[in-house]
Every structure is written in structure tokens, then in C-alpha cells.
Amino acid sequence: MFAFYFLTACISLKGVFGVSPSYNGLGLTPQMGWDNWNTFACDVSEQLLLDTADRISDLGLKDMGYKYVILDDCWSSGRDSDGFLVADKHKFPNGMGHVADHLHNNSFLFGMYSSAGEYTCAGYPGSLGREEEDAQFFANNRVDYLKYDNCYNKGQFGTPDVSYHRYKAMSDALNKTGRPIFYSLCNWGQDLTFYWGSGIANSWRMSGDITAEFTRPDSRCPCDGDEYDCKYAGFHCSIMNILNKAAPMGQNAGVGGWNDLDNLEVGVGNLTDDEEKAHFSMWAMVKSPLIIGADVNHLKASSYSIYSQASVIAINQDPKGIPATRVWRYYVSDTDEYGQGEIQMWSGPLDNGDQVVALLNGGSVARPMNTTLEEIFFDSNLGSKELTSTWDIYDLWANRVDNSTASAILEQNKAATGILYNATEQSYKDGLSKNDTRLFGQKIGSLSPNAILNTTVPAHGIAFYRLRPSA
């Protein structure tokens, strides 16, 4: 086996440069919500957004934290005589303000889309050079979130400085409106966005577009994993490809500014249940936004129970906001049909002194995997409290909603109330501070100094744990 080790330095670049917690007071935890693009692309309408919001609410997902309803590309019909954007009246007959009001009246937040280019990616009017009037359009329509893409940028890229100023123009324009608007950059990680994004935005994409494949290589996503400075980000990037590119970037993200690994593919395509669990777990662990990409009106029971796993979401919404680190990576001989095979261990600190740990199996067969306190607390010195204490192990995927119950909720034969965690009534921060057992998983054992944590991990699957100091 060929080993790769990625241990983050004790003093990260974020610490050196003193990145502020949030440039606009938003994004104190990674955003959660739904975006239409992965499933519907340009097939958008007022009815789709409002029906989807109602369904998210009925399924209890809004109260789990999925508050942003994000309208992606293809909503515009052009500009009016004053240069302001105009919504397509066939798709949105009552206008964007009506959509915003409906969502706000039902305790959602409204997201819209544009591009830092002459056109959007689908060829509609972009905002390059028109940042102030477009920002005012979004504010006038009571928008709470802007996804800002990178197509048709007139060649204004190639150095961090050029890209920074192109995206800063919209950041400044949004702030000038006086309306708090979450600013989500979608420039595919071009020009090292993770270095400069936190000063002007709340999240930033760090790779090409995701596809519903766990490991499959694709020539349209030409850079391999760990090529974090990809000159051509592309699209159709697999889950493992994006995850590996994100591995060294956690030190540049945190409260107020997050690495965005792209929308979730849980419930999209033909991923296995183990692949969907691994995908959701790792996005949660590295503090990526949790944006549902599926059609919530046609979710499988197993996918719904993944989206509603409170103990995993609590890792993502942890107030400390520190992305986990990949501690080790090995290539393995049992490769899958695409010639891919690797195993990894990730670890990261949590706000209340706990630690999150993942053993990820990218091989083609189930296998025993293990780790130790020395690996889990890789920055701790010998004799430290972390390495000389006993830790209780909690399985974060235990107590998952069973398929029968999930199906009953999806078929509206049973209410989600009382079954799912309600973060509207009690935030994840408050639930964690009060030791709400729903957020910690199920205790399965303990790990003492010099002992080994052993488990069997399914192919393309994960073992996902919270470690808590033993009483």
C-alpha cells in the first residue's frame, strides 16, 4: 500500500493572517437548504419553489435547519429599459417579491443566482459590470442569499488578485444595499479562492461541479484529487475527487466563511446507501454547506433518513466551526470498476471538547479498519490530557430513522413532529450544550490510552464517531 499523510501544521494560515469570523455577520455555521440545479437545472418556476418549500416543511427538514430555498440559473428574461433584471413572467407570474414573501411567511430564507460574467452559465444576463443595480434588484426582492457563478467572465481570472476584485465588486454592492445577504461564491476554486474568500464572502466553491458518482473518473473533471490549484476545474467531479481536493483547505475556513464542496447528491442518481452516508458524513465533517440537491417530492426513505440524521448534522453545525483534517490516506489493491481504491482517516475538534472521527473505505470490499488516540489527536504531545484519557465512543449513525418510519413520513401517514430533531425549537448549539442525547449518537464502547479502535467498514462506506471524555 502507498501511504499519504496530511497533518495540518499547529499554526494554520488562518491563524497567521487573522481571518475575521464573518465579514457581514452571516454564516456563523455552514448554510443548510435546497437548490434546484442538481435535479431540475433550467426547469424552474414559482410553483416548483413554493411546492418544494412546503414539502421541506412538511417533512420536518426545515426545522432541522434546511432554511434556504435557492433558485439557481434560468429565472430571468433579460433587463428592462433602466437596466434592471427582469424575472421571466411565464415562470414567475407573480414576481420574485411574491416568492420571497411566501417563503419568509413560512420561516424560510430566499436565495437567488447570478454570475460574475457577461452571462450566466445558461446564457442569461450576468452581473459583471452591473453589480450595484443587480445587488439592489436582489435587495428590493427581499433576497437573503446570492449564489454567484463564474461563467462568461471575459477572461478576468488568472491571478488571485484579479478574481478577488471581480467578486469583491458584488460583495461591496450587496453590503451597500443595507440588506443582510449571504454571499456564496461559485467560482470553482479558481485562483485559490480559499485564500481570499473569507474577506468578502460567506462560502466559496473549491472545485468543479459535483456528479452523483462516488469514485468514477471523468475527463470533464481533469484534475485528480489533491490537485487543489486546478487550472481547469471542469464538472462531473466525483465525491471522492472533490473530497481529496478539499483535504488541505480546512485551515482556511471557519466561522463566517466555508469551503463549499457543492450540493449534496444524496437522493440523486444511483449511489448506494453506504455511499450516501459517507458523502453526507464527510460534507458535514469538513463543514461544507449542506444543500439538498434532490427532488424532495421523490426521495427514497433511506435518503430521507440520511438528510434527517441530527447527530451528523450537529457535527456540521458545531459552533467551533473547525473543519476536520485528513490524518492519513492509503491506496489499496482492491480497486473498484474504475480502478479506484483508497482508505482514509479524518479527525477534528468540536466545541464541547469532543472529537469527531471518520474511517472512510474507498475500496471495493468491506474491510477491518482501525485507529488510535495518537492518530486521532495528531497535534497532541505525548503525555497530554488527550492521549492519557479514556474516551467514550458514540456511533453517529446509530438511532437512524428506520425505513418504515421514513416511508410513513414521506407518504404523509405519519408526522415528522416528535420523530426528528427540531432546531427551530432548540438550536444545535443549545442542544449540544444541554447534552441532548439525540445529537450524540449511541455509545458503543470506550477507547483507552494505548488501545486501538477497531471496526469493519463497508465498501465505499464510513464508520463515523463522536468521542467524548469518559466520565
From Swiss-Prot:
Residue pairs linked by disulfide bridges in the UniProt entry: 42-74, 121-151, 221-237, 223-230
CDD domains with a match to the protein in the record: GH27
Gene this protein is translated from: MEL6
Keyword annotations from UniProtKB, A to Z: Disulfide bond, Glycoprotein, Glycosidase, Hydrolase, Secreted, Signal
Active site: 149, 209
Protein name according to UniProt: Alpha-galactosidase 6
Signal peptide: 1-18
Gene Ontology MF annotations: alpha-galactosidase activity
InterPro entries with a match to the protein in the record: Aldolase_TIM, Glyco_hydro_27, Glyco_hydro_27/36_CS, Glyco_hydro_b, Glyco_hydro_melibiase, Glycoside_hydrolase_SF, Melibiase_C
Subunit record text: Homotetramer.
